[in-house]
Amino acid sequence: MARSGYTLPVFACAAAIAALQRLRQPAASIQSVDCHLIDPDQTVAIAIEQVAPLSPDRALAICRSDPGDNLDLTRGTPIWAEVQLSPRSPDQDSLAIEAGEGIGHSETGPAIYDYAQRLLRANLLPLLQTNEQLTVRLILPEGRRLAERTANAAFGVVEGLSLLGTHGVAEALSAPEQLQVFRDRLRQLSADPDLVIFCIGENGLDLSQKIGLPRDRQLKTANWLGPLLVEAGLLGIPRILLFGYHGKLLKLAGSIFHTHHHVADARREILAAYAIAAGASLEQVRSLLDFPTVDAATQYLDQTDPALASRLWPQIAEAIVDRSQAYIRRYSEQIPEIGVVLFGRDRQLLTASSQAQTWLTNRAIAQPLRYPSA
């Protein structure tokens, strides 16, 4: 059975708890701390690797990431939390959270997102006196290096990793056993003939909720898109909305239905092929293939030929629909309607298939599309 672990914010929070405990109890042995996950509503013990006082009012603690049986590059990476206690004035917040080395940042600030903020506040505020302020500085010593191997830059996060997540448990999404969990969830959703929303990854899940798509109809798919599309067909689910980052769902336009990069990655080649169909010149296609990432290629088109981009992305969305239905047709006589919504690195909606646009309109979700379908 695949083993679940915890998301990065949990280990950051545990390190902060341990550092604060060291200030409260300088002589105590701290091997682990209890951390309330909020979502799910449970308290778990998190191992602490090291903890040390730095001064009478400052301490440092270290955890190591354990994401369970996942293909996760943060496995074993250290997470440091440096805390400092100081007197609090009436106009100050009791908790100040700072991003240190290895924590990424975007145009809006440090990449310490909502769940991480709530987790820190829920666990640390009850430990403070009313006249105390705690400053927590989170550090990922290997964060800058690891970020080079992620898609963080595609979402505007640079110089480090993000503390992203909507819950505390890191399910073993890459393990075969997790596919069965997803199938069981899909069977539950099939009891209601309403739309089922396949959210590709944590960013897809988070953004779909923020724009108002119904949470109770969402299924986080990880990279198991092919098997889950087939399962949806076999279950007779009538409508599926694929909602995800354009650099991930682009693979479906090339009939790649297991989207983990360890399996296959031809995104630039797929983009170039559809660009030719949309009228790109040979020089433009060569430029697209020369860029290191799909995101860089997308920005190039946005800036140099928005007319081409406005043709290209809706065509890709429709191609994803066609290829997905063709894939289901191999295994099932029941073919659901499929809609596609793609978002970009700025977490704004890039384009949508014509069917998806209709569904969004019918649900009164008035999110603008950069490149709407004709």
From Swiss-Prot:
Keyword S-adenosyl-L-methionine: yes
Pfam families xref list: CbiD
Domain of life: Bacteria
Reactions mediated catalytically: Co-precorrin-5B + S-adenosyl-L-methionine = Co-precorrin-6A + S-adenosyl-L-homocysteine
Pathway: Cofactor biosynthesis; adenosylcobalamin biosynthesis; cob(II)yrinate a,c-diamide from sirohydrochlorin (anaerobic route): step 6/10
Class of enzymatic activity (EC top level): transferase
Keyword Mitochondrion: no
Membership in a protein family: Belongs to the CbiD family.
This protein's name: Cobalt-precorrin-5B C(1)-methyltransferase
Organism this protein belongs to: Synechococcus elongatus (strain ATCC 33912 / PCC 7942 / FACHB-805)
Gene: cbiD
